[in-house]
Amino acid sequence: MDHSMSKKLHDEALLHIVGGVNSPSRSNKGVGGGIPVTMERANGAYFYDVDGNKYIDYLAAFGPIITGHAHPHITEAITKAAQNGVLYGTPTKHEITFAKMLKEAIPSLEKVRFTNSGTEAVMTTIRVARAYTGRDKIIKFAGCYHGHFDLVLVEAGSGPSTLGIPDSAGVTKSTAEEVITVPFNDLASFKEALATWGNQVAAVLVEPIVGNFGMVEPAEGFLEAINELAHENGSLVIYDEVITAFRFMYGGAQNYLGVIPDLTAMGKIIGGGLPIGAYGGRIDIMEKVAPLGPAYQAGTHAGNPASILSGIACLEVLQEEGLYDRFQKYGSMLKDGIEKAAVKHGIAVTVNQIVGALTVYFTDEPVTNYAEAGATNGDLFGRFFKGMLEEGINLAPSKYEAWFITSAHSEADILETIQAVDTVFAKMVQDK
């Protein structure tokens, strides 16, 4: 494929934008470098770049675009918002409609508040949990990404009962010491952390199904045990459902798994492609939020009509009968096709697939936590990513990210993708 215009534009972007991208995940650092492709437009399941190349897209903007690009129902809603004014700074009736839709889909959301992003939603749930419990520390799980605010840019110390250390320049040591990081799916380490720091722990922050070191399900009984132990300790449980809400069913991963948190943070899908976040939970906890309580959260753009109307339209599309069954069918087809191609060419892969989301790890070992994900072969993934791009398949440029199937993908797209995998695996073996 010709990528000359993408290269020209990236060179120009480097002169004006830090690193040439507005989010580091858009660079190709995670796949060994190279020029990120600059896209011109998108429609349905397809991307079209500035050089005129067409791709089947599984990036889906890192998750939000579950209905495909430029879905007509969502486009109509956004157009209506633009015609009527995109920002008021006042309440609107649409906020009420959307809040009711979220509550009906995810019953643990007894009260809801809108924010501008998933990062803001998670950040505020922690603040609210601290206000409710009068405690300061949180427990999080290694490799789970919860946004780019200081408190969650923390990695594990030397063991499960040690305090965290900064995972980014600019995060202070004192901030990191408010966080205890333990391995996902490791109940013994979680118990040890609670035993050490329990009376200081305001909340346990967890992705109920991990989406940030690939798609990883909780071990049987893991989330139930977290709930029980946290509540015995007087701590709250916060689910970060920024990736998982409405991903596996019409509702949250908590509905899908049957385990209920105290607070939930959401983003991505619920905006239909526009910036949004939301959080909610038990009434007694949510009433700690201003103007009813002492925990402050505000935002000029929070609840803006464009994002709210886009979100309403997205959820309306997701109520289509049989849609999640189709996600499951296509997800299973992809997993099966990739695994068969890997066996055919003697390439070790593990595919974690949950409904319409999957991750291809280059390893013959199961992946159940961040350490295991980190041990997979990143060099092979980089070659695979670049090979798939040349075959017209757009993936996220990181071995830790998921593929997302949208309502716009067809069976023909899935079969074409499987053929591309076969072709790329063959080239990878040939070019050893």
UniProtKB/Swiss-Prot annotation:
GO terms for cellular component: cytoplasm. GO terms for biological process: protoporphyrinogen IX biosynthetic process. Its cofactor is pyridoxal 5'-phosphate. This is Glutamate-1-semialdehyde 2,1-aminomutase 2. PANTHER family: GLUTAMATE-1-SEMIALDEHYDE 2,1-AMINOMUTASE, GLUTAMATE-1-SEMIALDEHYDE 2,1-AMINOMUTASE 2. The gene is hemL2. Belongs to the class-III pyridoxal-phosphate-dependent aminotransferase family. HemL subfamily. Coiled coil: none annotated. InterPro entries: 4pyrrol_synth_GluAld_NH2Trfase, Aminotrans_3, Aminotrans_3_PPA_site, PyrdxlP-dep_Trfase, PyrdxlP-dep_Trfase_major, PyrdxlP-dep_Trfase_small. One of its GO terms (molecular function) is glutamate-1-semialdehyde 2,1-aminomutase activity.
